[in-house]
From Swiss-Prot:
One of its GO terms (cellular component) is excinuclease repair complex. The UvrABC repair system catalyzes the recognition and processing of DNA lesions. UvrC both incises the 5' and 3' sides of the lesion. The N-terminal half is responsible for the 3' incision and the C-terminal half is responsible for the 5' incision. It is found in: Cytoplasm. This is UvrABC system protein C. It comes from Sodalis glossinidius (strain morsitans). Gene3D superfamilies: 5' to 3' exonuclease, C-terminal subdomain (1.10.150.20), GIY-YIG endonuclease (3.40.1440.10), UVR domain (4.10.860.10), UvrC, RNAse H endonuclease domain (3.30.420.340).
């Protein structure tokens, strides 16, 4: 506790109702968030003579003040606790560092439905299948579905503006509903129904319908249709035979845990309709001294209660660990889902098999992660020794990308002691400079990045500039001119110049904007980490530049038309499927775009034609 915090006086004011408490340090930063059925009893436990762990002891020493929020029920307190943890990211809480929404497969409710991937809120009319563990799993499934059931995957704007079928129709991957006469509505809807059944896990029902269709076509001597049905039957059977399917065909999430060397891995298997859709490993941030029970309890709560509108809750969650607050957590999840959610810790049969698989995956992923982390630590230690500093806790790298001076983008990527910190990668639009002036672009991004107050943990030990002596000299001049409250003198500036052939391993490093610089051997661990962060920075800049260039290309022609603002530009491009289809459209077709009058459509038509 800090000298200004009087625990005895504070506890005398605390209620015994359920609620959430937030602990702050001297700087006003939230360092821990917790919840309690009885706030007074729970908070008093922190200030006993014998505390539970080293982590609690360190936490209590840092407390400057505590805020309390009273709730009606313990369930409400649990939900609020996880919202606060997500908001404040306290350093003494176990933190789930990956809170992205999961992708689903979406089958639209259009007259000719489209199948595609979807993330985020489910506002559009149609059917959602999932969740899938990552975008790659969705992409693979969509590619498979396209081979089995040829329904469209194109954007609505493209579908509405086609006058002839695309390549997907030519190679048999789409029935071509965009062009009248290629496929009947009944035939298309039949294929859509097959997709719906297949994604719902009703493979046998799909096969039964296809067999019936093949037999009917054969009896009617329609051998071409019979052959198509036969080919679909064979394709579906090949796919379904490859996957283990649970007999109960329920929706499950299976969670396995592994813990070693202060690091935890939580592996989640996603099972829908008895099929394993995929899996994903998580490595929550675990404060020193945290018990494994708290890690698992907190992970499960954060995983399902934070941003749960983006997540599809299964009917049952399997764990290989006994949760202290299992009943409370199940009640909270059931309340969120509007139906009963079970948490099972002693499964049998197929469920036990799934749990063993999750445990094995967690252990394997943890071994791999620890090995990778060890390699990163070794490389950073080698670089720190090379630069003559004690350690590298944070490193940032900058790169510039443009095409002939146009659409300039600067990137900043960050590494910490464990490697890349992708959540903190940033891009900067560079404006107001002479086109192609990389020095001015670097000057601008460095001033924007560092010309402000920085938290202690955000101050880099090393800043890498992707460029030679000239860029490094400019960067040093910028840092000399900075007037900031943090210690800028601790930052080591390092210039990295590519060799004449621009090949990896031939880089020259500069610590000063003069002299010969130094070259490291190709097998140098220090060089490897420099190449890693430099390549990440380059790729991040290139991607941002390409996105900006594409956006400008699509909108520049419309920006000159009076009466067409950002919203109308977006609406026109989305409805028409891009600038080229818009250029080819008639006045009447343009007038069909929502928000575009006949007069404005004529103005747009004339402007794009001339």
């Amino acid at each position: 506790m800090t000298d200004s915090f009087n625990a005895k006086q504070f506890l005398s004011t605390v209620t015994s109702q359920p609620g959430v408490y937030s602990m702050y340090d001297l700087s006003g930063t939230v360092i821990y968030v917790g919840k309690a059925k009885d706030l007074k009893k729970r908070l008093a436990s922190y200030f006993r003579a014998q505390v539970a762990s080293r982590k609690t002891e360190a936490l209590v020493k840092s407390i400057h003040h505590i805020d309390v929020t009273i709730t009606h029920t313990e369930t409400e307190a649990l939900l609020l606790e996880h919202n606060y943890i997500k908001l404040y990211q306290p350093r003494y809480n176990v933190l789930l560092r990956d809170d992205k929404s999961y992708p689903f497969i979406f089958l639209s409710g259009d007259a000719h439905p489209r199948i595609t991937s979807h993330r985020g809120a489910k506002h559009a009319k149609g059917d959602y299948f999932g969740p899938f563990p990552n975008g790659y799993a969705v992409k693979e499934t969509l590619a498979l579905l396209q081979k089995l059931f040829p329904i469209r995957q194109c954007e609505d704007s493209v579908y509405r503006n086609r006058s002839r079928p695309c390549l997907q129709y030519q190679i048999g991957r789409c029935l071509g509903p965009c062009v009248a006469g290629l496929v009947s509505d009944e035939e298309y809807q039949q294929q859509v129904e097959y997709v719906r059944l297949f994604l719902s896990g009703k493979d046998q029902q799909v096969l039964n319908q296809l067999v019936e269709r093949m037999e009917l076509a054969s009896r009617a001597l329609n051998f071409e249709d019979a052959a198509h049905a036969r080919d679909q039957i064979q394709a579906v059977r090949r796919v379904t035979e490859k996957q283990f399917v649970s007999g109960d065909r329920e929706d499950l999430d299976v969670i396995g845990v592994s813990f070693d060397a202060g690091m935890a891995c939580v592996h989640v298997l996603f099972i829908r309709q008895g099929k394993v859709l995929g899996s994903r490993s998580y490595f929550p941030k675990v404060p020193v001294g945290t018990e494994l029970a708290e890690v698992v309890q907190t992970f499960v709560g954060q995983f399902y209660l934070q941003g749960s509108q983006m997540r599809s809750l299964p009917g049952e969650i399997l764990l290989d660990f006994t949760l202290p607050e299992k009943t409370l957590l199940a009640a909270s999840l059931s309340e969120q889902a509007g139906r009963k959610i079970q948490i099972q810790t002693q499964p049998r049969g197929d469920r036990a098999r799934y749990l063993k698989l999750a445990r094995t995956n967690a252990a394997t992923a943890l071994v791999t992660k620890l090995s990778q982390q060890s390699t990163v630590h070794q490389r950073l230690a080698a670089l720190a020794e090379l630069l003559g500093i004690q350690a590298i806790n944070r490193m940032e790298c900058f790169d510039i990308s443009h095409t002939m001076g146009e659409h300039t983008i600067a990137s900043c990527v960050i590494f910490d002691g464990n490697g890349s910190v992708r959540a903190e990668y940033r891009r900067y639009n560079i404006e107001g400079i002479t086109p192609g002036d990389d020095y001015a672009a670097m000057d601008q991004v460095l001033r924007r990045r560092y010309g402000k107050a920085l938290e202690e943990k955000k101050i880099p030990d090393v800043v890498i500039i992707d460029g030679g002596k000239g860029q490094l000299g400019m960067a040093k001049a910028v840092f000399e001119q900075l007037e900031v409250p943090w210690d800028k003198s601790r930052v080591v500036l390092l210039g990295v110049a590519k060799g004449v052939d621009r090949k990896a391993g031939l880089e020259t490093l500069f610590l000063q904007p003069h002299g010969e610089g130094m070259a490291l051997p190709p097998d140098s661990p220090a060089l490897h980490v420099i190449q890693h962060i430099r390549d990440d920075s380059h790729n991040h800049a290139i991607t941002g530049h390409r996105n900006k260039r594409a956006k400008v290309k699509n909108t520049s022609a419309l920006e000159l038309i009076e009466g067409v603002g950002p919203r109308r530009r977006q609406s026109l491009l989305k409805y028409m499927g891009g600038l080229q289809p818009l250029r080819n459209a008639s006045v009447e077709e343009i007038a069909q775009v929502p928000g575009i009058s006949g007069a404005l459509a004529e103005k747009i038509f004339n402007a794009l034609k001339h």
